[in-house]
Amino acid sequence: ESGAVVHLQGIARDTTDEISDFMEAASAAGVDLILSSAGVSVGEYDFVKAAISTHGKIDFWRVNLRPGKPLAFGQYRTIPFFGLPGNPVSSFVTFLLFVQPAIQKMCGLVNDPSRRLSAYLQQPVQSDGRESYLRAHAHLSPDGDIHAQLAGSHQGSANLLGLVASNALLIVPSGVKSLPIGARVDLLLIGDLTNE
């Protein structure tokens, strides 16, 4: 869907040496981009930063985003590198926002602007003030307006059920802590728009 041909390396154990070996194998395979998931935060088993630094650099490793704060970007040797968060929803969101556009640009493809829509919110939404991408369900009403509500019981970054039940990510801009019912919001479609 993004335009890339995947060269799967498999799963590395949580050691700097094994992660470095995987990076070397990717480099030797002649890939144009290295992508990893997990191991980019600051926990006891997060060794990606150390592995990259042996033959590369990290340009940034955090973004002010929910979900998806631990996101790394840099180079391994001369190859661009993205390190996605380990939580599945965080990984999904950061892939859509950062990695997919990079792959499409590298392939000479254009991002599809029709995936961004405006909708009317059907429930109040609270946020912590960070730019947030909340799992939502969007539908087209008989009057032609698009309406959206949150999907799933909570927005935790490990909640896959909410992601499966959603067809859109509801975008809460940075600095916004609450949105009332009826507020006009931006959406990023991740599935098909449904009818009411």
Sequence positions of predicted segments:
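Small/polar loops that bind or transfer phosphate-bearing groups
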Residues: I11, S36-S37, G83, T94
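Glycine-rich beta-strand-to-loop/alpha-helix junction loops that act as flexible
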Residues: V31-V48, P85
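Short glycine/serine/threonine-rich phosphate/pyrophosphate-binding segments
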Residues: I19, V42-Y45, S91-F92
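Phosphate-binding glycine-rich loops and their immediate beta-loop-alpha structural context
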Residues: E1-S36
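Short, ordered loop/turn segments at secondary-structure junctions
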Residues: A4, I11-D14, G39-V40, K57, ...
